[in-house]
């Protein structure tokens, strides 16, 4: 019996690549949708995937890519035009009579978040759930282990783990576990249609916990160092992160400090959906530590030390001006995820204990501060 053809968007990305590989192992026909052909797409083609090239906002090319496809893994491009791409995909999915979409979204997705990307994730989730005749499964991880391990080379060579999460914790999942949850949903729509899953690691970890795990992975003592947001943003820019992503990520630093990623974590979703326990952070860290750029060599040490010296000198982006020039919409009452009643209700998070009523003076101070914050946007 011929198995369904499944299209994977973002097929050369962190989860898409694994989704393609796992589906091919299980004998599915896989069409990998990529923005351009390169060595990564050639690798997927060599392993048996069909390659389709399309910009996600190009409605006609996306419609062509979905011909003769029955199921889809949808990982949206993280750019300001996410909604354009999602609408193009939903229209094509309806015309192609897709059976099932497994959509990658965010744990933070909510309608009044200050991040445009996060508000768009919330809308995309609803768009696919409303697409007639197409079943929908949501995969909504928090910050991946991959994000924390972006600095493992720094830790390996200089013994320092930069931390931007304040006193909060997270149970970060691996790219592989997130992808395996998506694959399980794609291969059994009857079981997973209409459901939402939050892949996590097996335990909540603080910055200090992660530093110790990384130290064991790289074979040296590593201490975590709280990093101010301005330095984190400069380092991210130096690492090649584009301004449109940084404009959103600055808010996730605040969400992290507010404890958004420890709420409701860890979950049993990876085990329940895939039948395998999630990878622990140290196991993931050992895999990253073994990569050539992170191995402890003199050349790598020079690169990391130079990065340490240069990061504070990198000019920062004016993110508020960028948002204004693009005329980005902004909610009238912006709320980080833990402060949003809608987010808490939709994610099964109990409301925090009621705070004592504020005095007139406290209300005045709060209103003044909020007004200044909004004006800065």
Functional labels for PLM-detected ranges:
Residues 48-50, 136:
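Short, conserved active-site loop motifs that form the nucleotide-linked donor/cofactor pocket
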Residues 43-46, 53:
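N-terminal Rossmann-like NAD(P) cofactor-binding subdomain of oxidoreductases
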Residues 54, 227:
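Cofactor-binding loops of NAD(P)H-dependent oxidoreductases
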Residues 75:
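Catalytic metal- and UDP-sugar-binding loop of GT-A-like glycosyltransferases, i.e.
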Residues 1-43, 57-60, 67, 78-87, ...:
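Oxidoreductase cofactor-interface core, primarily capturing Rossmann-like NAD(P)-dependent enzymes
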Residues 30, 47, 362-365:
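N-terminal cationic amphipathic segment used for targeting or macromolecule association
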Residues 231-377:
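A hydrophobic C-terminal alpha-helical subdomain
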